[in-house]
């Protein structure tokens, strides 16, 4: 099993607090994060995991819910949770 360092951006922490305030089911986010931490790849198709482009090149996007996404970066040595939120909040 690959062992990676795990990082959380400062903005990710703020995004999580906002999701909690909006009464999102945080267990869904935690489960997706656990899959990534445990290197359960590829992710199940329900998460619609895909690479991002443009200014987010090098990052990936997985859907917690249809309009709630997790942006993360995965390398051989690092798993970085960058952002979470709606498409409009993150890309709009």
UniProtKB/Swiss-Prot annotation:
Changing residue 48 to A: Moderate decrease in RNAase activity. It comes from the Bacteria. SUPFAM superfamilies: RelE-like. It comes from Escherichia coli (strain B / BL21-DE3). The active site is at 87 (proton donor). GO terms for molecular function: DNA binding; RNA binding; RNA endonuclease activity. Its EC number is 3.1.-.-. This is mRNA interferase toxin YafQ. Pfam families: YafQ_toxin (PF15738). One of its GO terms (biological process) is mRNA catabolic process. Keywords: DNA-binding, Endonuclease, Hydrolase, Nuclease, Repressor, RNA-binding, Toxin-antitoxin system, Transcription, Transcription regulation. PANTHER family: MRNA INTERFERASE TOXIN YAFQ (PTHR40588:SF1).
